[in-house]
Every structure is written in structure tokens, then in C-alpha cells.
């Protein structure tokens, strides 16, 4: 639908000033009259643009430290007035039509994220006039264009140039959708913040103040539709958060290959989050959301070679993640050796991409380098509800470990124990990981009985001819019985790292002592379901 509307008058009032000067200049150059408020008006005037302050237009000053400035009939009448229907009443009250509203809102999220933010600080960053104008303009999108994203500025000017200064109804409708999404997300942030403040407001403890809000509002943006979901009879799409601050599969750039599938994204996330645990050059290979091979070394080439050796059969059609740039030598080793669905790394060299391009089905993602892990929430959907918890960023240092066995671990055993403990965090429970010399040699995942996970890890190692004697074993949760220790001892494990906490800890420790195994408690569990 065309239904073009010329843009003759625009109201600009933005907190985020990025691109606003250039946009205002472009509008003014095309004969658009500019109205503006406060800091935005001053900025435009400083740049020599002809701009009318809203207070001059309404004849009513800004007041109450800027709390009241655009809440006026001459503003909202100009936005909400229906062209061809309300013209007479607008003329009677000297209300000029406003054809475009350019608004983004007070930075509430940034304010409450700052350390030491008080309730008073948060309250003063709740925008009132801005959302009201946004909603008014979006409601009247038949006649008015509402612009809430600076990323739309260039496209709007191009369309105006192509349509003699007008915008089509299709464009105004699309802009209105973005506007309602913008205000919905904004109000959700405010509701979540105030909901989380209820205990503190009523004088409860700091611990109580950290509880989750009583109503949880979530906003995600669709990044892509998918051919199907986890199975071909399920429809699916991928939604992402705005302003993600950590390198992730959601922010990664696909530089090569066909579109990612639902399972590709889930598995790539598992691989990337695991490889982030390591500071040394590391490789993680994932299949069906479980690591099937992990290693660290002096180079990603050697790390890949060692990770692959853990379980070459499962690595076929897997996802490979690195924590260093993908180089040509490593890319060649992968392509020559196996079929791979996705490779993700902080970056990829041009030479590496030329090599992987020879395999059209290989998807290559670059996610940028990451720094500190960012706390957040994890969600698990259940029928009729949503489980919410803090993201599992729990880590233990060497100083926090407790040796509970008679024998102390050797330095190598301790290194291997810490290594496989990091891996176990990303293996589906019940999780058992065998590791030796900074590589996994057997992984038992997802078994209902912990002892069977231990047995499977041993079988995996034997199948690949990997030496288990002198290796470390990690368990994501405590051993309820000694049978898991007996199974590990039978294949030559010499060191066990586990959370501890079973009512039979004494029995389990005694089994370790009986077999001459060093046992370490972390006092931290890493269930993963």
C-alpha cells in the first residue's frame, strides 16, 4: 500500500544523539520544519539548524526540571490529529500537524545497571513524555511517521528522496511496529526493576532484595526464521536479546556457509560457552549439545588434534569451537579429516576462509574476543511456566579445593583435575569426564546412573586406545555410592574431583583411599539438564 504522506514538520527529542545532527540536517535541507526540546534543540541550534523549541511553539514553558515539556494539546493534537477528519478542530485551536516524530527514551537500563544506582536515580530516568509521543505517533501511523531507531535514519531519507519528500504507509506501519516494540521493552525494564525492588522498599534484607521480580517481562528480537525446529515437523525461529555485552552465538557473524539450523545454534552455543572456560589455546567439539572432545595446548591446531582423538566417531558432523583465531593450518586439518557442521572462533584469517570455502556446507562464525563473563539469567520452559535461575558462572580456584583423601594429588593430576572439572560443567548430567595431560580421554554423559556414566567414559577411552592409567576424573555432582570410584579405579584413574556432599561421603572417600586415588572436593555442583 502506497498512501504517501509528505513530511513537512518533524519533532525531534532524543536521549541517544547518535546520528541526529546529520538526520536533522537532511530533513531541514528537504524543507522540513524542525521542532525540538531541551538538549536536542540546543544541539541542533549550535549546529546552525533552524529549530523551534517546543515551549515556544506551545507557549508553555518546560517545567519541573524537564518533567513536563511535551505533554501539551498542541503537541499531541498535532501528532494524533487525523488528516482530513480533524483539520477544522486543529485549525480552530492553532494546532499544526506534526508529520514525523523522532524520539528515543531516557536511558533507564543503563542507569539501573550502574553500581550504586538509587531508587531516586532510577525514577528520574523514567521517561514520560517520550513514550507518550511514541505511542501517539504509532497509533496515528496512517498519517505520522514515528522513528525510534537511529539505524533507520538513512533509509528514511532515501525513501523521501524517492517519493518527493513523502513516506509510504508500508514504511509508516513498519516504523509503528518498531515503536510499540520499543515502548513495550522500555516498560518491561521498568516493571522488572521495580518488581525486584519490592523487598528492599519494604525494609527486608539485602538478600531478599535480590529475589526475582514478581512479574517477569522478556523482550527478544527475531533474528531469523528457520526451515524447522529440533525436528522437521516443528516450526522455529531464533530470537536474540538487545545489547548483548558478551561474545555469543547470538551476536556472532556468519561469514560462510548456508543458514544455521535450530540444532546448529543450540550446539554452537554449547561449544562456545565451554571453550570460554579456558585461557590457553583450546578446542571444544560438541555433538548433540554435549562435548565429545576438549583439549588445550600451545596452539589451536594441536588442541584440535587432541580434542578430535577423544572420540572421532562422535566428532563427525559436530560443532567445533576455538578461543583463538582460526588459522589456515587448523582449517586445513579440519577439512581434510572430518565433516563439520559449524566452526566458531573469535576471528578467522582470510587464508582459513579460503580453505573452508571449498566445503560449501561448512558454516563459519566469528564472534569476537570475549572478556569477563557477564552475569545474566537462564531460562527453561516447562508446560505452563518458566524456570528462571542465575547463569552458572560458578568457578573454583586451586586455593578453594579440598583434598579429602589420604594421598595428595600430584601437580599433573591437579592440572588434569581442574581441566576436566571445567569440561564437566558443560556435559549433561549425570556427567563424568576422564582427562589426561590437558585433553579429554573419555566422556560419559546424560546417564540416569552416575556409575554408568563412569563406565561409558572408560569404554570410550578404551575404544580409542587412549591410556586411562594416571588420569583424572571429574563428576558434576557427588557420588551417592562408592561404585563410581570402583569403576574409575578399575580402568586406572588416579585422581577424582567432585563436589562432595553425599551422606555417604565417608564411604566414597574410603573407596578412594582403598584404591590409592587422590580425591578433591570442590563444594560446588554443576548439574546440567
From Swiss-Prot:
It catalyses: (6R)-10-formyltetrahydrofolate + 5-amino-1-(5-phospho-beta-D-ribosyl)imidazole-4-carboxamide = 5-formamido-1-(5-phospho-D-ribosyl)imidazole-4-carboxamide + (6S)-5,6,7,8-tetrahydrofolate; IMP + H2O = 5-formamido-1-(5-phospho-D-ribosyl)imidazole-4-carboxamide. Keywords: Hydrolase, Multifunctional enzyme, Purine biosynthesis, Transferase. GO terms for biological process: 'de novo' IMP biosynthetic process. It holds the Pfam family AICARFT_IMPCHas. CDD domains: IMPCH. SMART domains: AICARFT_IMPCHas, MGS. Pathway: Purine metabolism; IMP biosynthesis via de novo pathway; 5-formamido-1-(5-phospho-D-ribosyl)imidazole-4-carboxamide from 5-amino-1-(5-phospho-D-ribosyl)imidazole-4-carboxamide (10-formyl THF route): step 1/1; Purine metabolism; IMP biosynthesis via de novo pathway; IMP from 5-formamido-1-(5-phospho-D-ribosyl)imidazole-4-carboxamide: step 1/1. InterPro entries: AICAR_Tfase_dup_dom_sf (IPR024051), Cytidine_deaminase-like (IPR016193), MGS-like_dom (IPR011607), MGS-like_dom_sf (IPR036914), PurH-like (IPR002695). One of its GO terms (molecular function) is IMP cyclohydrolase activity. GO terms for cellular component: cytosol. Residues 1-148 form the MGS-like domain. Its EC number is 2.1.2.3, 3.5.4.10. SUPFAM superfamilies: Cytidine deaminase-like (SSF53927), Methylglyoxal synthase-like (SSF52335). The IMP cyclohydrolase activity resides in the N-terminal region. PANTHER family: BIFUNCTIONAL PURINE BIOSYNTHESIS PROTEIN ATIC, BIFUNCTIONAL PURINE BIOSYNTHESIS PROTEIN PURH. Belongs to the PurH family. This is Bifunctional purine biosynthesis protein PurH. It comes from Salmonella paratyphi B (strain ATCC BAA-1250 / SPB7). The gene is purH.
